[in-house]
From Swiss-Prot:
UniProt record, GO biological process: L-histidine biosynthetic process; methionine biosynthetic process; purine nucleotide biosynthetic process; tetrahydrofolate interconversion
Alphabetically ordered keywords of this record: Amino-acid biosynthesis, Histidine biosynthesis, Hydrolase, Methionine biosynthesis, Multifunctional enzyme, NADP, One-carbon metabolism, Oxidoreductase, Purine biosynthesis
Reactions catalysed: (6R)-5,10-methylene-5,6,7,8-tetrahydrofolate + NADP(+) = (6R)-5,10-methenyltetrahydrofolate + NADPH; (6R)-5,10-methenyltetrahydrofolate + H2O = (6R)-10-formyltetrahydrofolate + H(+)
CDD domains: NAD_bind_m-THF_DH_Cyclohyd
Quaternary structure annotation from Swiss-Prot or TrEMBL: Homodimer.
Protein name (record): Bifunctional protein FolD 1
Gene (UniProt): folD1
Length: 298
């Protein structure tokens, strides 16, 4: 048995296409254009690439893109003032502050200064609480993308055993909550978990989000399980640099029923879900029906 390869790149393209269609319809029917503001502080090379890609895809979807680039030495008060202006701007429906921030800034305070209704990253404490109580919330983009891929692959997730390896606020915890909201039986594993390999072998759904290259091997995986690899790790191998996930793909693929590759799996879903969240925020701000992007993107 060789696992079905879950093509996140193709699925994300479908989501972006549906977002673009909905944006065009929104403008034609109501004269409303969703707007996404992205704030970058400093000159982190990876962050610059992410921000550039977000701007390109935002504009391709027919949305307004507002990019604010501030020097690394910017005072936190100045950043807070910018966020306050964006909160008050009716043309801006989504606000994203690119992480990581410079060390002198309090990232938690900055994120919680964003209007929760415009918090398209889903990191504001109010959205975290709403998600945790099963209410309507802005959902973090990467876990939302993972859930879309799981629903497309498996259909109804209720009753399945899910193990999420990693307990970060950005991926692990919200992923576990989303799966719980889907009526899965969920276990969160972390660095102190005993017999991690044995626990992983109980999972019908295994989500790896630990940031350790190829940590999860094929003999950790239940035959036929669906494996979602969130990890993006750059390693040197055979004299060249390459990206690998948290799962050892070569040993996992013959065991799993379905698996996301790295690259081309979860990664493309993140920006697609950011666009979907921005559209959702725009619809909510204008009292309009929200498109449903929770199902298949193709």
């Amino acid at each position: 048995m060789v696992a079905r390869i879950i093509d996140g790149k193709a699925f994300a393209s479908g989501v972006r296409g549906r977002v673009a269609s909905a944006v065009a319809g929104l403008e034609a029917a109501h004269g409303v254009v969703p707007g996404l503001a992205v704030v970058l502080v400093g000159e982190d090379p990876a962050s610059q690439v992410y921000v550039r890609n977000k701007g390109i895809q935002t504009r391709e979807a027919g949305m307004a893109s507002f990019e604010h680039k501030l020097p690394a030495e910017t005072a936190q008060a100045e950043l807070m003032a910018l966020i306050e202006r964006l909160n008050a701007d009716p043309a801006v429906h989504g606000i994203l502050v690119q992480l990581p921030l410079p060390r002198h800034m309090d990232a938690e305070a900055v994120i919680n200064a964003i209007d929760p209704k415009k918090d398209v990253d889903g990191f504001h404490v109010l959205n975290v609480g709403l998600l945790g109580t099963g209410q309507k919330a802005m959902v973090p983009c990467t876990p939302l993308g993972c859930l879309m891929l799981l629903r497309d692959t498996l259909g109804d997730l209720s009753g399945l055993n899910a193990v999420v390896v990693g307990r970060s606020n950005i991926v692990g915890k919200p992923m576990a909550q989303l799966l719980l909201n889907e009526s899965c039986t969920v276990t969160i594993a972390h660095s102190r978990t005993r017999d991690l390999a044995g626990l992983c072998r109980t999972a019908d759904i295994l989500v790896a989000a630990v940031g350790r290259p190829r940590m999860i091997r094929g003999d950790w995986i239940k035959p036929g399980a669906t494996v979602i690899d969130v990890g993006i790790n750059r390693i040197e191998e055979a004299g060249r640099s390459r990206l690998v996930g948290d799962v050892d793909f070569d040993s996992a693929a013959p065991v799993a029923g379905a698996i996301t590759p790295v690259p081309g799996g979860v990664g493309p879903m993140t920006i697609a879900c950011l666009l979907a969240n921005t559209l959702t925020a725009c619809c909510r701000a204008n009292g309009l029906p929200e498109p449903d992007f929770a199902e298949a993107g193709g």
